[in-house]
């Protein structure tokens, strides 16, 4: 990877945030890691990341959706991955299987938390086309 890609990572779980940020930095990415929707919105106002990975539910149940909407409104070309443990915690299946769902939510990909960091990086590379 010759270009250094910037990943905006927003999650209110400090352990998950640390683990993913550590792995992505080790893989050569610049990572801007924040713990809240408000912090992520401040980052979006100041810079354009190459890709974003948002927790679906942070301080509110729809934080990830709101961040996705705001990022895509400002930078429509920036891919967004929503990562969540909703299915594991509630048993409710959530996904972005149809184009209609992805268009409404504006996320490019949905991943269940617990995905291996290597798999997350593979998905990031696919979305960045590297």
Locate predicted features.
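Alpha4 helix (beta4-alpha4-beta5 surface) of REC/receiver domains from two-component response regulators
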Residues: 66, 86-112, 118-122
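Non-catalytic signal-transmission and effector/linker regions of two-component phosphorelay proteins
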Residues: 1-6, 112, 116-130
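Two-component/phosphorelay signaling modules centered on CheY-like receiver
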Residues: 14-32
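Active-site beta3 strand of CheY-like receiver
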Residues: 47-54, 58
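Conserved sequence signature across two-component system core domains
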Residues: 10-11, 34, 52
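Short amphipathic alpha-helix used as the core "switch/output" element in two-component signaling
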Residues: 42, 65-76, 97-98
């Amino acid at each position: 990877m010759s270009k250094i890609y910037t990943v905006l990572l927003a999650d209110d779980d400090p352990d998950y945030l640390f683990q993913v940020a550590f792995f992505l930095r080790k893989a050569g990415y610049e990572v801007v890691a924040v713990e809240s929707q408000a912090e992520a919105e401040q980052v979006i106002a100041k810079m354009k990341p190459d890709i974003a990975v948002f927790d679906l539910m942070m301080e509110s149940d729809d934080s990830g959706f709101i961040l996705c909407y705001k990022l895509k409104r400002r930078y429509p070309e920036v891919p967004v991955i929503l990562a969540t443990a909703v299915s594991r915690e509630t048993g409710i299946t959530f996904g972005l299987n149809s184009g209609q769902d992805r268009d409404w939510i504006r996320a490019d990909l949905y991943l269940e938390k617990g995905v291996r960091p290597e798999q997350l990086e593979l998905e990031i590379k696919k979305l960045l086309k590297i």
